């Protein structure tokens, strides 16, 4: 009698199913929970405006930060992140899992970014700094200065000096226009305060003229203690009808022709900004003045000085007479030149 075929035990199928489930679970755990070492720390994930979850997942997968972009998209959509993902800069350190990334994006709190605007910069340098900042959305990069000012509601005015130098914190993904607006509004507030607190009988007719003076002071010295004295020299010269004769104004008027050195011919070459050939203040500011320069222009030192010369250590020597000034020039400039 032939033997009957043996039946497979019914208990084998649950085991196979359990093994399959455990295998999938282990794979999902590896994909979702097990961290990946980052290529650099901190790793910066920048998400621009209107970027989709799929685009973010693809970018992360291409860089090897996540192991499976489709799983990230499924999990993200299950949390509704395809509708509420927030633009910005997200920083991660050491190692990170897909789950860590999803939770950060779901929280929607990107790290802050910063833009530092230096005292004494000109408007061209400000634009370059904003254009180079990778955390800013660049709407105005290809606009002319006039187009940019028009978007800010400013017409028939030069941009120089209108933006306050400071460090601005912002949410990554912010528009460059927002940064320009903040810097302009801050300068207006600072200028109004300086104008309201100014000494009486200064030779400024408008806050804008005070701003021009502050920009000249800013370019002449970076030493806080000297700024009120420099402002006093300029105010005294204006009151006496003397020309300001400040080299930074000549350099500004030279534009791109300035290559690091200024000659006697440059001092004689007339431009609207040459305070050796023109009376009074320059037609516009020549830099972005900071708080100390604004305060110095509004409250110059009580001094009769009409001249100053750089001493070579960052400070200046101030003189009331031309004879004293010439002696200081011989001491600090000519003597130094002969020793070099």
Across the structure, where does each feature detected by a protein language model lie?
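N-terminal type II signal-anchor transmembrane helix
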Residues: 2-42
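Bacterial extracytoplasmic/cell-wall-associated proteins, especially those involved in peptidoglycan
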Residues: 128, 132-139, 149-340
């Amino acid at each position: 009698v032939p033997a009957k075929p043996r039946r497979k035990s019914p208990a084998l199928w649950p085991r196979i199913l359990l093994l399959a489930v455990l295998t999938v679970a282990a794979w999902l755990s590896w994909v979702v929970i097990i961290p990946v070492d980052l290529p650099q720390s901190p790793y910066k994930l920048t998400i621009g405006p209107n970027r989709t979850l799929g685009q973010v997942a693809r970018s992360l997968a291409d860089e090897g930060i996540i192991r499976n972009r489709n799983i990230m998209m499924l999990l993200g959509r299950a949390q509704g992140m395809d509708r509420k993902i927030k633009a910005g800069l997200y920083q991660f350190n050491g190692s990170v899992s897909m789950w860590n990334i999803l939770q950060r994006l779901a929280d929607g709190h990107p790290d802050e970014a910063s833009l530092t605007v230096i005292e004494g910069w000109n408007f061209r340098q400000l634009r370059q700094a904003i254009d180079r900042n990778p955390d800013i959305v660049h709407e105005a990069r290809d606009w002319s200065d006039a187009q940019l000012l028009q978007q800010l509601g400013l017409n028939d005015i030069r941009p120089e000096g209108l933006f306050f130098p400071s460090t601005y914190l912002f949410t990554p993904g912010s528009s460059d226009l927002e940064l320009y607006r903040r810097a302009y509004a801050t300068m207006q507030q600072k200028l109004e305060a300086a104008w309201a607190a100014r000494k009486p009988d200064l030779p400024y007719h408008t806050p804008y003229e005070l701003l021009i003076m502050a920009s000249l002071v800013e370019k002449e010295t970076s030493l806080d203690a000297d700024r009120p004295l420099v402002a006093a020299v300029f105010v005294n010269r204006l009151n006496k009808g003397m020309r300001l004769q400040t080299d930074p104004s000549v350099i500004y008027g030279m534009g791109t022709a300035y290559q690091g050195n200024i000659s006697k011919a440059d001092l004689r070459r007339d431009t609207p900004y040459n305070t050796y050939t023109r009376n009074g203040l320059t037609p516009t500011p020549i830099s972005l003045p900071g708080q100390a320069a604004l305060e110095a222009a509004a409250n110059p030192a009580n001094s009769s000085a009409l001249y100053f010369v750089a001493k070579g250590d960052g400070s200046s020597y101030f003189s009331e007479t031309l004879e004293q000034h010439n002696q200081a020039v011989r001491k600090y400039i000519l003597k130094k030149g002969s020793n070099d």
